[in-house]
Structure formats: structure tokens, C-alpha cells
Amino acid sequence: MNLSQSFLLNRYIQSPRTWLHRLNSNNKIYFLFFYLSIFPYTDVKYMTYSIIFYTILFLYLKHIDKNYKIFILRIVYKVCIFTLAISCLSKLLLSVNIFRLKYISDFFLNLMSICTRNILYIRSVLILTHYFCTVHITFMTTTYEDIIFAFIPLFTQYQNNIIKKVAFISIFALQAIENTLIKIYSILITIKMKQFTKVFKFQYYIYIYLILKFIQDIYNDIYRISTVFYVRELNHKMSYFTYIY
């Protein structure tokens, strides 16, 4: 059985290649693994800066087929305009009597107080957003096989049941998740193409049918995979990892 068969290639950008593609896959994966491990312990301010950087990087990858110099200039231009607008607005508010410095200070103090009370939720949202952006950009610039093979030296060095279980489950879990996402995208495309939203009389019945069909497909996939594992007696004890690069 080919465990390195990838269902994530639909995210990978084959062409054109960027500087992220040319980085060594092992070094890139090790750095991101270490970076994501220490990221939850950083300050909220640095989390926000990091998410802004990832957003710019993500937009850059989305528009890589265009002239990237013009795209970068547009981003810098928009950031400068936004900064200038905030600066002018602040000076305008300070010049108006109704918005004195005292009221502006109270506003920022109240805003900081609200952020402090909800700092746990803010950190959670920032961490989840950062993880999502990091994983998505990694899959856009690194093949799934390179990600798995980056950890092969560790698997060969520490051959024990726990690592084999984690590797065995992770390989099939990622493929199953991607297959589930493909099913969801197919349902959404079907709804848009058939224009079910215009059929008000049977709209909810169609949605219920699609949801039940989706659950039935997931059950069939689980049953089929479990049957194959049982018939062929596949488990983590049969996993043998070797570094082929």
C-alpha cells in the first residue's frame, strides 16, 4: 500500500515557483514545527504582527501568476494610505472640541479594558488563525510527501510503537480529512450550479437530503477503510519507514 499517496496536491502550487518552494523542505518543516510550538507563548502584539505578515504572504501566493512587483507596490500603497488616513483622522478628532483628549483617552482605556477581559478568547482566535494560515501556506509551497519524509529520519532513529501509531494514524487521517473537504466542496458546487436556493418550497428538504447523503458517504468511507484494514490485517506494526532521499 502506498502510504505517500497524496490528496493534498490540489493545494500545492506547481507553477510558478517562488522562493518558498526553493527552500529545503526538511529545514522549512523543522523551523515551522519549532515555531508553532513556541507561538502560543508569545505576546498578543507579536501574534497580530505575524498574522498580518501571513496575510500579505498568502495574498502574494494567490496572485503569484501576476506581476508580483506591482502587487507588492499595491499592498505598500494601501498600507501607507491607511496609515495616513488614521493619522489625519486622529488630528481631526483632536481639533474638534467634542472629541477632546480626555474622551479619546477614555475611549482607548475602555477598549484596552475590554481587550484585557477577553484576552483569552482573543489569544485563542489569533492562535487558531495563525495555525490555519501557516498550514495552508505550507501545503501551498510544500508537497505532502516532503512533509512526511521530513520526519522519516526521526522515525528510523526511534523505532517504537508510539511513533509508528502516530505516523500511521496521521497519514490516513490527513487523507481522510482532505477527502471529506472535497465532498463538502462538491456539495457547495452542486448547490450553486443547481440553484437550490431559488426553490423555496423544497429548499430545506434538499439541504436535509444533502446532509444525510454526506453523512452516509463518510460512513461508507469509514466502513470501507476498516474492512480493508481488517481483511489485509494492516496495522501500525507493519509500518516500516526508511529514508529514501
Swiss-Prot record:
Key words, A-Z: Chloroplast, Membrane, Plastid, Transmembrane, Transmembrane helix
Major location category of this protein: plastid
Domain of life: Eukaryota
GO cellular component: chloroplast membrane
Subcellular location: Plastid, Chloroplast membrane
Chain segments annotated as transmembrane: 38-58, 79-99, 119-141, 171-191, 199-219
Topological type in the membrane: Multi-pass membrane protein
Family the UniProt entry places it in: Belongs to the ycf92 family.
Protein name listed in UniProt: Uncharacterized protein ycf92
Protein source organism: Gracilaria tenuistipitata var. liui (Red alga)
Name of the encoding gene: ycf92
